[in-house]
Amino acid sequence: MNNIIISVDGPAGSGKERIAKYIAKNYFLYHLDSGILYRRLASKILKNKIDYKNKILLKKFIKSIDYISPRAHKLLRKEEIGNKTSKISAIPFVRQFINFQQKIIVKNMLKSYRGCVIDGRDIGSKVFKEAKIKLFIEVKPKIRAKRRHKQLIERGEKSIYSRILKEINLRDNSDINRKESPLVIPDGAIYIHNSDSFRSTINQIKKALKTI
């Protein structure tokens, strides 16, 4: 089966990227992390000192960009870029631009791969409604916060669990209530519970993808 599109949606910190990478590697698909596109755009905005609150200036700047690279880079994970990303991702014309970029990337990659797996927050509900298989990742906020806290501590970075939990709840509220492409469960989506071990998650994924 070729030209397979699989969407992986879920809230911040739910493990979408890890799950999408696993699917891409084990089912020979191209993986597109939509979050990287937003982070790359945020990085460009910071580098060019564009005031994102000035919508006219921001729209003009975005129109000057032909292509956003989907390649990941550790510098894109900087907190400054993450904060800017969360702000610009709520702007309707920014989301429309990134959605268009995703369409271009997937169209090109389907020429070389048997399919694509894309992770984000509105992939199955908005960007790729035609996805053959739609997954929605579920993890309780407290578990997501604990995982993030542990991750930061292991990196040698300072971390306060209560602060992380608060940020996750705020991000969830923002994603669910934004006007443009809110976080919703796509029609026909298969729930993947990622609160336990990753082995348990893998078993659910294998069951969901048995038709491909």
Task: Place the predicted regions along the sequence by residue.
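Hydrophobic anchor at the beta1->P-loop junction of P-loop NTPases
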Residues: 6-8
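ATP-binding Walker
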Residues: 11-14
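Post-Walker A helix-loop "phosphate-sensing" segment adjacent to the P-loop in P-loop NTPases
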Residues: 24-33
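ATP-dependent small-molecule kinase phosphotransfer cores
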Residues: 37-114, 122-125, 142-146, 154, ...
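Phosphate-binding beta-loop-alpha motif at adenosine-nucleotide cofactor sites
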Residues: 133, 183-200
